[in-house]
């Protein structure tokens, strides 16, 4: 807090609500409370964080109505937002500015250069304090190479996922454009060219799936959420690998 006091937040309930395989899907818009949860699951080895680097909102604010201190019936001065504290992980690291880094990375259309605390001028820097005394419930590090291998093999043959990647690449290309033509005919031609490129990507996806191709870009509908689908596949992989790893670690694996 602002006075330098460290308050450790604890739970009186020592029982686990769920003990099965757990993944936490995050992206650059995951901020504040969702970052605290993801970081806690990661630090305790309780859950696998997948997706994109999170927002990096690790500060605590309070609102102070300025009208309370003003004279007059209806001054209308608004309110002041004051930072009064910071959140820290049990490791002592802050989530401020850096956010939470995923254990397995998935592509995202959200630019980390444009969204997040680190992209804002004057944002509070990352820092750390002394670690808390805590006990890890598990460790996913030994499973990551096999999970990554399964993920890479699966997405290589997933038309929906590859379509999502191509859409993200097209969006990133548009972000790099530093000028816009003021000529109306040229602008329309550029827009039509992008529509045709999107139609080509969609039809490539459809052909791979054995679906009929479309004739116009206006016929394109939102495809399945490939990122969410792959997150579910990774969770399924984890549910298969985690018991085997625990059995090997405890010496109870009989090779079956």
Q: Locations of the language-model features?
A:
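C-terminal "post-core" interaction segments
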Residues: 1-256
């Amino acid at each position: 807090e602002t006075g330098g006091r460290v308050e450790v937040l604890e739970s009186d309930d020592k029982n686990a609500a769920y003990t099965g395989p757990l993944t936490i899907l995050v992206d650059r818009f995951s901020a504040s409370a969702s970052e605290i949860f993801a970081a806690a699951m990661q630090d305790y080895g309780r859950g696998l964080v997948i997706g994109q680097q999170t927002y990096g909102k690790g500060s605590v604010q309070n609102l102070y109505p300025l009208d309370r201190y003003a004279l007059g019936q209806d001054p209308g001065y608004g309110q002041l937002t004051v930072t009064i504290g910071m959140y820290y992980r049990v490791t002592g690291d802050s989530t401020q500015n850096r956010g939470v880094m995923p254990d397995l990375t998935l592509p995202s259309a959200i630019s980390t250069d444009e969204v997040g605390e680190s992209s804002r001028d004057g944002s509070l820097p990352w820092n750390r304090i002394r670690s808390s005394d805590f006990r890890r419930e598990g460790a996913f590090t030994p499973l990551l190479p096999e999970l990554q291998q399964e993920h890479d093999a699966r997405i290589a043959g997933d038309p929906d996922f590859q379509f999502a990647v191509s859409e993200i690449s097209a969006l990133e290309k548009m972000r790099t454009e530093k000028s816009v033509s003021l000529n109306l005919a040229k602008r329309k031609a550029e827009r039509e060219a992008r529509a045709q490129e999107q139609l080509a990507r969609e039809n490539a996806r459809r052909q791979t799936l054995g679906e009929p191709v479309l004739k116009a870009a206006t016929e394109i509908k939102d495809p399945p959420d490939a990122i969410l689908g792959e997150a579910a596949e990774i969770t399924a992989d984890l549910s298969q690998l985690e018991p085997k790893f625990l059995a090997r670690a405890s010496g109870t694996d009989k090779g079956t």
